Amino acid sequence: MNIHEYQGKEVLRKYGVSVPEGKVAFTAEEAVEKAESLSSSVYVVKAQIHAGGRGKAGGVKIAKTKDEVKEYAEELLGKTLVTHQTGPDGQVIKRLLIEEGCDIKKEYYVGLVLDRATSRIVLMASEEGGTEIEEVAEKTPEKIKKAVIDPAVGLQGYQAREIAFAINIPKELVGKAAKFMLGLYKAFVEKDCSIAEINPLVVTGDGNVMALDAKLNFDSNALYRQKDIMEYRDLDEEDPKEIEASKYDLSYISLDGNIGCMVNGAGLAMSTMDIIKHYGGEPANFLDVGGGATAEKVTEAFKIILSDQNVKGIFVNIFGGIMKCDVIAEGVVEATRQVGLTLPLVVRLEGTNVDLGKKILNESGLNITSAESMADGAQKIVSLV
């Protein structure tokens, strides 16, 4: 789950991580009120959407007067901001962060990620702050410094200090930088983060080390024990189809292709997308109906897939283990009739009660193409769309 920058800073502040003073505003008038409550002569007006690249896209403004705060707030609120992370449709700005300006001396990057190669949390840092870390990794990978963290003992002070020295934090501020990193790590672990990025981390003219921006992502599987984080959820920033899918315990992620996929099991779902690509097609979604799908869930899955106007055909790929193929077949038939499906539909069933499932499909009288294997199904749906 993603949250807004201002929410991320609220979380970090509780862990002793230094961030600028700032307040959220939903109207231009409220933006001025928030600016008046800050003890600063320079203000930063920042669009709050769940995407990076806001500065380059014009979503961050420096205001030197209250009138400019109002002017920028009116300009940004309601505007669709398009960044390299939003896609071409962009995101509508519905809230702003009004923040105190600060005297920036140097920008850095600090981040915590889960590294699958080492099965550890890794602290990454670079003196190339303010730019995309992927760009730094590609062009000057030697400028990224890393510390692999032992989960038994956590991030150690000496590791944080080594990283601070390695990215050329001024010697007199290494202690503050290390404290910053230790607080960030504690927040990462205790709040079940999957990513914590500070870009930029800045050294200020008055000798402070603070997070000028903050990106925190959280493990959705751990949200049941993070009630305070759940309160930060902003449904306006999420795909309506994904929200609808979550109501039925369906795992759905929208993609850019035209072949809708309905599969049981995340591994099989990813393999299905891969094989569609292999045969020249483009998947329109990842959709895992799980191991306990009912006819109702299958029907809702169809409705969600078909709500995407780009979908030109559907591939149902089911391996019945816990789930029975006849139940899936009944759901497919019911869903096809309910939604009045006119698009090509290819179904591959294998596993428990597969013969009964195929019989239900064959006797339905509906235009359903059966497939004998995953490869056969992928080739058939690609040829039909």
UniProtKB/Swiss-Prot annotation:
<dbReference type="Pfam" id="PF00549">
    <property type="entry name" value="Ligase_CoA"/>
</dbReference>
<comment type="similarity">
    <text>Belongs to the succinate/malate CoA ligase beta subunit family.</text>
</comment>
<dbReference type="GO" id="GO:0004776">
    <property type="term" value="F:succinate-CoA ligase (GDP-forming) activity"/>
</dbReference>
<feature type="binding site">
    <location>
        <position position="213"/>
    </location>
    <ligand>
        <name>Mg(2+)</name>
    </ligand>
</feature>
<keyword id="KW-0479">Metal-binding</keyword>
<feature type="binding site">
    <location>
        <position position="46"/>
    </location>
    <ligand>
        <name>ATP</name>
    </ligand>
</feature>
<feature type="binding site">
    <location>
        <begin position="321"/>
        <end position="323"/>
    </location>
    <ligand>
        <name>substrate</name>
    </ligand>
</feature>
<dbReference type="GO" id="GO:0006099">
    <property type="term" value="P:tricarboxylic acid cycle"/>
</dbReference>
<dbReference type="InterPro" id="IPR013650">
    <property type="entry name" value="ATP-grasp_succ-CoA_synth-type"/>
</dbReference>
<dbReference type="GO" id="GO:0006104">
    <property type="term" value="P:succinyl-CoA metabolic process"/>
</dbReference>
<protein>
    <recommendedName>
        <fullName>Succinate--CoA ligase [ADP-forming] subunit beta</fullName>
        <ecNumber>6.2.1.5</ecNumber>
    </recommendedName>
</protein>
<dbReference type="Pfam" id="PF08442">
    <property type="entry name" value="ATP-grasp_2"/>
</dbReference>
<dbReference type="GO" id="GO:0005524">
    <property type="term" value="F:ATP binding"/>
</dbReference>
<keyword id="KW-0436">Ligase</keyword>
<dbReference type="InterPro" id="IPR016102">
    <property type="entry name" value="Succinyl-CoA_synth-like"/>
</dbReference>
<keyword id="KW-0067">ATP-binding</keyword>
<keyword id="KW-0816">Tricarboxylic acid cycle</keyword>
<feature type="binding site">
    <location>
        <begin position="53"/>
        <end position="55"/>
    </location>
    <ligand>
        <name>ATP</name>
    </ligand>
</feature>
<dbReference type="InterPro" id="IPR011761">
    <property type="entry name" value="ATP-grasp"/>
</dbReference>
<feature type="binding site">
    <location>
        <position position="107"/>
    </location>
    <ligand>
        <name>ATP</name>
    </ligand>
</feature>
<dbReference type="InterPro" id="IPR005809">
    <property type="entry name" value="Succ_CoA_ligase-like_bsu"/>
</dbReference>
<comment type="subunit">
    <text>Heterotetramer of two alpha and two beta subunits.</text>
</comment>
<dbReference type="InterPro" id="IPR013815">
    <property type="entry name" value="ATP_grasp_subdomain_1"/>
</dbReference>
<feature type="domain" description="ATP-grasp">
    <location>
        <begin position="9"/>
        <end position="244"/>
    </location>
</feature>
<dbReference type="InterPro" id="IPR005811">
    <property type="entry name" value="SUCC_ACL_C"/>
</dbReference>
<keyword id="KW-0547">Nucleotide-binding</keyword>
<dbReference type="GO" id="GO:0004775">
    <property type="term" value="F:succinate-CoA ligase (ADP-forming) activity"/>
</dbReference>
<comment type="function">
    <text>Succinyl-CoA synthetase functions in the citric acid cycle (TCA), coupling the hydrolysis of succinyl-CoA to the synthesis of either ATP or GTP and thus represents the only step of substrate-level phosphorylation in the TCA. The beta subunit provides nucleotide specificity of the enzyme and binds the substrate succinate, while the binding sites for coenzyme A and phosphate are found in the alpha subunit.</text>
</comment>
<feature type="binding site">
    <location>
        <position position="264"/>
    </location>
    <ligand>
        <name>substrate</name>
    </ligand>
</feature>
<dbReference type="GO" id="GO:0000287">
    <property type="term" value="F:magnesium ion binding"/>
</dbReference>
<feature type="binding site">
    <location>
        <position position="199"/>
    </location>
    <ligand>
        <name>Mg(2+)</name>
    </ligand>
</feature>
<dbReference type="InterPro" id="IPR017866">
    <property type="entry name" value="Succ-CoA_synthase_bsu_CS"/>
</dbReference>
<keyword id="KW-0460">Magnesium</keyword>
<dbReference type="GO" id="GO:0042709">
    <property type="term" value="C:succinate-CoA ligase complex"/>
</dbReference>
<dbReference type="GO" id="GO:0005829">
    <property type="term" value="C:cytosol"/>
</dbReference>
<feature type="binding site">
    <location>
        <position position="102"/>
    </location>
    <ligand>
        <name>ATP</name>
    </ligand>
</feature>
<comment type="pathway">
    <text>Carbohydrate metabolism; tricarboxylic acid cycle; succinate from succinyl-CoA (ligase route): step 1/1.</text>
</comment>
<feature type="binding site">
    <location>
        <position position="99"/>
    </location>
    <ligand>
        <name>ATP</name>
    </ligand>
</feature>
